[in-house]
Design a protein with these regions (language model features):
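Conserved SAM-binding loop and adjacent beta-strand
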Residues: 121-123, 390-402
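Small/polar loops that bind or transfer phosphate-bearing groups
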Residues: 121, 198-199, 418
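Conserved beta-strand signature within the Rossmann-like core of class I S-adenosyl-L-methionine
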Residues: 193-197
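Basic, amphipathic juxtamembrane/active-site segments
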Residues: 155-171, 431-449
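Conserved proline-anchored active-site loop of SAM-dependent methyltransferases
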Residues: 138-156, 211, 410, 416-431
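Mobile active-site "lid"/loop adjacent to the S-adenosyl-L-methionine
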Residues: 148-177, 181, 190-192, 203
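Accessory, often C-terminal, charged low-complexity segments
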Residues: 2-100, 109-112, 117-118, 133-141, ...
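Short glycine/proline-rich turn/loop motifs
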Residues: 107-115, 159-166, 379-392
């Protein structure tokens, strides 16, 4: 045995000739050196395997060493491009190894103001994502996340401790943390789904390569540069940092980015040297048309008489422009503003030229990769939180609602997920946009409750804006809990998990079980018998979740076309292992 180990060591240290077919001197000096090294190592591994097979057929240790060699070969041949980082185990990983995650409801927090059902989940987002895999695999249309930026200034907590700048594994911990969550996020995305990830300079380059590996470089849609503030302090080492990034990745080619469509009542009825064009008013109309709705979009421009003018809303109050200051400057510079005098004042319009002279086509405007003032900045987010809560310092570095709205309008999204929910901006944006365009979008937010953030900030914000703005929305508050994994048999474990099934059923179907008749849960044959006698209820029912020992008549499927799922196996197939 000692001889075998010595030979293995010698081979691995380079004591054996490289490959039987040697490369020429010229070949070894040009081309892919990493590939050459892999081939050389692979050749060594092959010779080690051959020796072990011939060394001792009867030696059981040789078989064990062969399995080690297979692992080495797999590692050598695996990654050809990408990040190399140390994988780290989190405390939640151990929690999930020793326990089964479940959900419990805080019923006191239920909000019913009509509209769609939404969910707020309190707990570690890794556990929450594993639960969402059971209910929403392939169903999420849009994910927005604002993960910790890993600044080293107490923004990234790993295993209950802040990761500071002196931690030698700082970036590895962040990447290991994100990799697990992004892999789960990918499994939740629909085929036409998209994910937006807010980042700053610290981890943006690493996250880009990580997303290429997980989601595919071919699914990279672009990178938005968002101007989060104008000016600011002089504390940065070299530049005053005014921007952050939003990475955009799709799940597959089925994702469709919705360009802005410009429609004007008058049509292409005007003409200049550039051709036929529509005149689209630059003053905002419809919802959110007032100055206070977007302060950064209220600024003066000069009319043809050289006088300063400000936008006016349709009701005569101070308004806002449709575009930001930088875009307005571009329009002026490129002579794309058309002026008309109405009621004694000059009114500016954007010129939208016809496509190839075909007046039947509608102009589609591509979204610009740099967001200037159009979507607001962190100051706007801070001001909004102060207004909602009536006090300052509610949450640091929140994103403005208008930024999330801008992302939402470019995707066909019914189900929206944010598993770094923070102050709840994503939920707020979804409800606001629904109220403006009559949409039926639904959101799931996930956040931990560190310093009471989930209860005191995320939930409280959603509750307050629903009440104040009269948003048509429902909200359930769930919490991640754990059931210990024991040596108990199937029936004992099934009985325990059935106590938590209602929450998963509600989450999957987007319902409140008490008031919704489209879904039924029957855990005993007595309950099944009562349900089967209730013909009116069966006529409304679409899905029945039944316990493992419950028997239903064939008519349930044949006559009523009801889908039947056996629980807890439907959600916890691992119970059968």
């Amino acid at each position: 045995m000692r001889t075998v180990l010595v030979v293995v060591a010698v081979f691995l240290l380079g004591g054996v000739a490289m490959a039987k077919e040697k490369k020429t001197v010229q070949d070894s000096r040009i081309g892919n050196l990493s590939k050459l090294r892999r081939e050389q190592l692979s050749a060594k591994v092959s010779e080690i395997r051959s020796y072990l097979r011939e060394a001792s057929v009867a030696d059981t240790n040789a078989e064990r060493l062969l399995s080690f060699v297979a692992e080495l070969e797999k590692e050598v041949r695996s990654r050809k491009y990408g990040l190399i980082f140390e994988e780290h185990k989190e405390r939640v990983d151990i929690e999930l190894e020793e326990n089964i995650p479940v959900l419990t409801e805080n019923k006191k927090c239920f909000i019913d103001n009509g509209g769609e059902m939404n969910f707020l989940i309190e707990g570690d987002n890794l556990a929450a994502l594993k639960l969402l895999e059971k209910t929403h695999r392939g169903k999420i249309d849009l994910i927005y996340i604002d993960p910790p930026y890993n600044t080293g200034n107490k923004d990234f907590i790993y295993n209950d401790s802040f990761v500071d700048k002196t931690d030698g594994y700082r970036h590895s911990k962040w990447l290991s943390f994100m990799e697990k969550r992004l892999k789960l996020a990918k499994s939740l995305m629909s085929s036409s789904g998209v994910i937006f990830i807010s980042l700053n300079d610290i981890e943006q380059p690493n996250c880009r390569v990580l997303c290429d590996a997980i989601l595919g470089e071919c699914n990279f849609c672009g990178q938005i540069i968002w101007r989060k503030k104008a000016g600011g302090g002089q504390t940065d080492d070299f530049f005053v940092t005014e921007h952050e990034y939003v990475l955009v990745y799709r799940k597959t080619k089925a994702f469709e980015w919705i360009d802005d469509t410009i429609v004007a009542d008058a049509g292409f009825n005007k003409e200049d040297d550039g051709g036929k064009f529509k005149a689209v008013k630059l003053e905002k109309w419809g919802s959110s048309a007032h100055k206070e709705d977007r302060l950064t979009m209220w600024f003066p421009i000069k009319d043809p008489a050289g006088k300063k003018m400000y936008p006016i809303a349709p009701d005569g109050l101070p308004g806002r422009w449709r575009v930001g200051q930088k875009r307005m400057q571009d329009l002026e510079k490129n002579k794309l503003i058309y002026w008309e005098k109405k009621d004694g004042r000059w009114v500016p319009y954007e010129k939208i030229y016809s496509i190839d002279g075909d007046l039947s086509k509608i102009k589609k405007v591509k979204c610009r990769s740099i967001f200037y003032d159009e979507v607001g900045g962190t100051g706007d987010a801070t001001d909004m939180l102060t207004e909602i809560f009536g006090k300052k310092d509610i949450f640091s570095n929140a994103k403005p609602v208008s930024l999330i709205e801008e992302l939402l309008v470019h995707a066909k999204a019914n189900f929206i997920l944010d598993f770094f929910a923070g102050s709840g901006t994503t939920g707020h944006a979804v409800m606001k946009l629904n109220s403006e365009d009559g949409g039926k979008r639904k959101f799931i937010l996930v956040t931990n409750n560190e310093n009471g953030i989930c209860e005191k900030v995320t939930y409280e914000r959603l509750k307050r804006v629903i009440n104040k703005e009269k948003y048509a929305a429902k909200l359930k508050y769930f919490k991640v809990d754990y059931v210990p994994i024991t040596e108990a048999g199937y029936w004992e474990r099934a009985e325990e998990l059935l106590k938590y099934i209602r929450e998963l059923v509600e989450l999957e179907n987007g319902i409140d079980f008490v008031h919704d008749k489209s879904v039924a849960i029957v855990l005993t044959n007595k309950e099944a018998e009562a349900l089967q006698k209730d013909k009116k209820r069966l006529a409304l029912c679409k899905t029945i979740y039944k316990g493992p020992n419950v028997l239903l008549t064939p008519e349930i499927k044949t006559e009523y076309n009801i889908d039947v799922k056996t629980i807890p196996d439907y959600y916890y197939p691992e119970l059968e292992d």
